[in-house]
UniProtKB/Swiss-Prot annotation:
Domain LysM: 28-71, 199-242
Region (7 X 2 AA tandem repeats of T-N): 330-343
Catalytic activity, EC: 3.4.-.-
A molecular function GO annotation: cysteine-type peptidase activity
Class in the EC hierarchy, top level: hydrolase
UniProt cross-references to NCBIfam families, sorted A to Z: PRK13914.1 (NF010495)
One Pfam family cited in the UniProt record for this chain: SH3_3
Lineage: Bacteria, Bacillati, Bacillota, Bacilli, Bacillales
Recorded name of the encoding gene: iap
PROSITE patterns: LYSM, NLPC_P60, SH3B
Protein name: Probable endopeptidase p60
Residue span of region Disordered: 154-199, 247-348
Positions with biased composition (Low complexity): 172-185, 288-348
Length: 467
């Protein structure tokens, strides 16, 4: 009688398994060794953490050496077709933000979910057989209905427009219909298609939007605008439209030719005096860059204008040393620039504590992609919001914020500076440095403190920027 009951129970169990779980390919017993984890065992056996826990009646992920686990290897028959709901979605090498980024896939891309991990991440197949891991909250069962303009920059001014739902409502001519060849005037607004001055850049491994902006002598914001990019993330093989500048907008390196103009205002004797006064200048690099911006807005900090910044201090504090040949014009111009630098330094010192205080107000708030605050944030939305509270305007994306700041070393970094990270496809994360190797940032787990050299951060650290 007991044998009969056992047979019936076993048969029922098999029936339930057949309908409630993936098909079992094979079963085996694994003896846990030191250093083993459920996730590691699941990966090596082609199953999932949840499947192992269910098969062994485990309520936690804790296992001990010598423990025997029944592992059912599952066949990958049950696969779900899903669509990317985010504008761009990072594909990582493992299930979590601690793993490196393999690439980014565009919103609306269809993917196949192979497995689901206990933390909500999915292993997916995309682009004809490539695999990786994504956060499951950015996948949906329905294809996104957001119309996407797919444009190709060629030698002739042709463009390919996706379905007719992409209404060209921004065309200035009232009578213009939604026909493909019509809106030539609108192409100046739709920046991705540019005239004869346009070229197409094929993204290669190691490319970043910042590097491309320097290479082509255009701004990060222009490249993002021309290609309808909402973030600075780009991927290998992506085609980017680059408009060659019609005016001579020289790259930063070429602006060295403007240096003699700054030197005309400063006699050689003043240069020597300013060097003697270097020890009293605590922020020589910052002051130099601010003054250079006043003289030549498109160039980075150059050595030539630096003496004029310190000249005013030399003339004011040590007239005996400056007795050789200071000119009145030098004092006048230097005074203007020195005042600007002094005010900027005072603003930075005064606003640092206010920035940190504002950032701390939002600790614990939730992360959301594209969140601008005040209830949810993404990383660059958080920094932009906090700085705006102190009257400082930042660009919207982490890449653009990186491009707009002055690069400084970690030894120079102070609370209130920005700290940047690159997961492999360009600047893709930013936080507010608070000192002692710590930052406040908006990441997948919300607004929180993080150690910039800790696990998941240190190997992606790019450097620091000062606003």
């Amino acid at each position: 009688m007991n044998m009969k009951k056992a047979t019936i129970a076993a048969t029922a169990g098999i029936a339930v398994t057949a309908f409630a779980a993936p098909t079992i390919a094979s079963a085996s017993t694994v003896v846990v060794e030191a250093g083993d984890t459920l996730w590691g065992i699941a990966q090596s056996k082609g199953t999932t953490v949840d499947a192992i826990k269910k098969a062994n009646n485990l309520t936690t992920d804790k296992i001990v050496p010598g423990q025997k686990l029944q592992v059912n290897e599952v066949a990958t028959e049950e696969k779900a077709e899903k669509s990317v709901s985010a504008t761009w979605l990072n594909v990582r090498s493992g299930a979590g933000v601690d793993h490196s980024i393999l690439t980014s896939i565009k919103g609306g891309t269809k993917v196949t979910v192979e497995t689901t991990e206990s933390n909500g991440w999915h292993k997916i197949t995309y682009n004809d057989g490539k695999t990786g891991y994504v956060n499951g909250k950015y996948l949906t069962d329905k294809a996104t209905s957001t119309p996407v303009v797919k444009q190709e920059v060629k030698k002739e001014t042709t463009q390919q427009v996706k379905p007719a739902t992409e209404a060209k409502t921004e065309v200035k001519q009232p009578t213009t219909q939604q026909t493909a060849p019509a809106p030539k005037a609108a192409e100046t607004k739709e920046a991705p298609v540019v005239d004869q001055n346009a070229t197409t850049h094929n993204v290669k491994s190691g490319d970043t939007i910042w590097a491309l902006s320097v290479k082509y002598g255009v701004s990060v914001q222009d490249i993002m605008s021309w290609n309808n990019l909402s973030s600075s993330s780009i991927y290998v093989g992506q085609k980017l439209a680059i408009k060659q500048p019609t005016k001579t907008v020289a790259p930063k390196a070429e602006t060295k030719t403007q240096a003699p103009a700054a030197e005309k205002q400063t006699a050689p004797a003043v240069k020597e005096n300013s060097n003697a006064n270097t020890a009293t200048t605590e922020k020589k690099e910052t002051a130099t860059e601010q003054q250079t911006t006043t003289k030549a807005p498109t160039q980075a900090a150059k050595p030539a204008p630096a003496p004029s910044t310190n000249t005013n201090k030399t003339n004011t504090t040590n007239n005996n040393t400056n007795a050789s040949t200071p000119s009145k014009n030098t004092n006048t111009n230097t005074n203007t620039n020195t005042n600007t630098n002094t005010n900027q330094g005072s603003t930075n010192n005064a606003s640092a504590s206010a920035l940190i205080a504002e950032a701390q107000k939002h600790l614990g708030k939730a992360y959301s992609w594209g969140g601008n605050g005040p209830t949810t944030f993404d990383c660059s939305g958080f920094t932009k919001y906090v700085f705006a509270k102190s009257g400082i305007s930042l660009p919207r994306t982490s890449g653009a914020q990186y491009a707009s700041t002055t690069r400084i070393s970690e030894s120079q970094a102070k609370p209130g500076d920005l700290v940047f990270f690159d997961y492999g496809s360009g600047i893709s994360h930013v936080g507010i440095y608070v000192g002692n190797g710590q930052m406040i940032n908006a990441q997948d787990n919300g607004v929180k403190y993080d150690n910039i050299h800790g696990a998941g951060w240190g190997k992606f650290l790019v450097g620091f920027g000062r606003v």
